[in-house]
Amino acid sequence: MQNVDNTAVIDAANALPGRLTSIPVSPLHAVHGHSMTYIPEGMDLAFFAMGCFWGAERLFWQQPGVYSTAAGYSGGHTPNPTYHEVCSGRTGHAEVVRVVFDPAVISYQQLLQIFWENHDPAQGMRQGGDVGTQYRSAIYVLTPEQEEQAHKSRERFQQAMEKAGDQRVITSEITVALPFYYAEDDHQQYLHKNPHGYCGLGGIGVCLPPNV
């Protein structure tokens, strides 16, 4: 098998071919009981990568105004990858949380605040002890408005880090969302099904300044 550099995202030419069939998942969210795929009228969609998706998904499903969440893969090349394939570093995907939310209750700006304040966005291709391109920090945007807000929030958080004495450069990528592929069902709402399971999520003690 070809050796893979786990500090660089693989290119499309060398990525695994994947498959045409999608990974089956439960139709209903194990916590909220809502559809895992349907987006009701008036709801919005967002995608965030914060390292291992187990803890990140729980963080978002706990927020008032979040209708449903899902763990999955995005940002890479391989269609309908398996968890094992993503962990091999040969798909280009990050572990991503899909968030369906009610903007009348929780804004995209508030979701960005949750994103920045609850992981380390300056670690490159890792998050704590989890090492590999699948653990990179990312915001995958769906609209020009989301893109603008994401970039501005990154600038504010970078300034806040510097003010706090952290001179590292944020490595979080902000790009237009590519196709999202659902992870296997045992990864969905993992920390609800396994309350004492692994969670490597943790912030750096810096708050996102308000958007003024």
UniProtKB/Swiss-Prot annotation:
<dbReference type="GO" id="GO:0005737">
    <property type="term" value="C:cytoplasm"/>
</dbReference>
<dbReference type="GO" id="GO:0034599">
    <property type="term" value="P:cellular response to oxidative stress"/>
</dbReference>
<dbReference type="InterPro" id="IPR050162">
    <property type="entry name" value="MsrA_MetSO_reductase"/>
</dbReference>
<comment type="similarity">
    <text>Belongs to the MsrA Met sulfoxide reductase family.</text>
</comment>
<dbReference type="GO" id="GO:0036456">
    <property type="term" value="F:L-methionine-(S)-S-oxide reductase activity"/>
</dbReference>
<comment type="function">
    <text>Has an important function as a repair enzyme for proteins that have been inactivated by oxidation. Catalyzes the reversible oxidation-reduction of methionine sulfoxide in proteins to methionine.</text>
</comment>
<dbReference type="GO" id="GO:0036211">
    <property type="term" value="P:protein modification process"/>
</dbReference>
<dbReference type="InterPro" id="IPR036509">
    <property type="entry name" value="Met_Sox_Rdtase_MsrA_sf"/>
</dbReference>
<dbReference type="Pfam" id="PF01625">
    <property type="entry name" value="PMSR"/>
</dbReference>
<protein>
    <recommendedName>
        <fullName>Peptide methionine sulfoxide reductase MsrA</fullName>
        <ecNumber>1.8.4.11</ecNumber>
    </recommendedName>
</protein>
<keyword id="KW-0560">Oxidoreductase</keyword>
<dbReference type="GO" id="GO:0008113">
    <property type="term" value="F:peptide-methionine (S)-S-oxide reductase activity"/>
</dbReference>
<feature type="active site">
    <location>
        <position position="52"/>
    </location>
</feature>
<dbReference type="InterPro" id="IPR002569">
    <property type="entry name" value="Met_Sox_Rdtase_MsrA_dom"/>
</dbReference>
